[in-house]
Amino acid sequence: MFLQRCMSFLQCIFAAVLAWIGVRGQQVHGASQFSSTGKVNPATIKVVNNVISQASATPSSVNYHFTRQCNYKCGFCFHTAKTSFVLPIEEAKRGLQLLKESGLEKINFSGGEPFIHDRGDFLGKLVQYCKHDLQLPSVSIVSNGSMIREKWFQTYGEYLDILAISCDSFDEDTNQTIGRAQGRKSHLDNLFKVRDWCRKYKVAFKINSVINTFNVDEDMRENITELNPVRWKVFQCLLIDGENAGENSLREAERFLISDQQFQDFLERHSSISCLVPESNQKMRDSYLILDEYMRFLDCREGRKDPSKSILDVGVEEAIQFSGFDEKMFLKRGGKYVWSKADMRLEW
């Protein structure tokens, strides 16, 4: 009981300080921080608990979207080309070093299209740095696959654990409708070619699919079985204000949305695929640590991307407090798995 009172007292003090200085606008606007009895408003305590949880989070797995540029125009994209900024490589390395010192185990490079900048050489140098210099257990990439060349694997493949290729349909016309294409080039030809290179250069191959209006009734079992990825990540199409929804967005993803029941039906139809890893909207919103091109954590809990200050300016410990990251949900969705190719025991 004494300990509970101490904790309650500390919460009150902390809440009072937050009420005075403000928590980046996270206070409950229009509501008093204290009730008429002098007790802290429950909504304020919730804010405090969220901040405490985020402050104690370890950035074991981080998604670094170092570029927003892309050669595809997927209609539901939630990280669109609002800027062309890319950090100088030495600054990016400094940020990655800060993350490693804070507990980073897995880095995932994404975009935009990560191979678009400097024809993949910038990406390759970061991959090499993370595996060789930082000795991270897992280094991975998410790409649309269209700009990858075998020469890249020859130079950097040994440093990469997992390569995920985004593929939403095994029908070329559907890919064209979605925007998962460049001109009339075959997205599927690239998919199979990259899969073969992954086998040749000993990189674990993964597939990411966004389930939406145009592919929700598709049966992908035969194709996924043939490709045989180590993981098939299946996402429910998600709206993010300012990215693919709202007046300032570069995409209008509303027409791609499906219901929770439609998503569940798709999962049940593909339940025989053992490598399937489903992610609903609920799981996605707060279970990822996302760094943008300025190395700011992005808080997506309110259906938009609220950035922290850059870890390059304030450090990881301070910036992560405004990430919206729920470590429990991260673990619940299976965010921690066998992510080093050295531990996968794959037959190449």
Swiss-Prot record:
InterPro entries according to UniProt: Aldolase_TIM, Elp3/MiaA/NifB-like_rSAM, RSAD2, RSAD2/Viperin_antiviral, rSAM
Protein's membrane topology: Peripheral membrane protein
Annotated localization: Endoplasmic reticulum membrane
Induction remark: By interferon type I, type II and LPS. Induced by infection with viral hemorrhagic septicemia virus (VHSV), presumably through type I interferon pathway.
Listed SMART domains: Elp3
An annotated Gene Ontology molecular function: catalytic activity
Record note on cofactor: Binds 1 [4Fe-4S] cluster. The cluster is coordinated with 3 cysteines and an exchangeable S-adenosyl-L-methionine.
A GO term from the CC aspect: lipid droplet
Highest taxon of source: Eukaryota
Pfam families: Fer4_12, Radical_SAM
Cofactor(s) annotated in UniProt: [4Fe-4S] cluster
Family, similarity comment: Belongs to the radical SAM superfamily. RSAD2 family.
Protein name, per record: S-adenosylmethionine-dependent nucleotide dehydratase RSAD2
Organism, as annotated: Oncorhynchus mykiss
Designated gene of the protein: rsad2
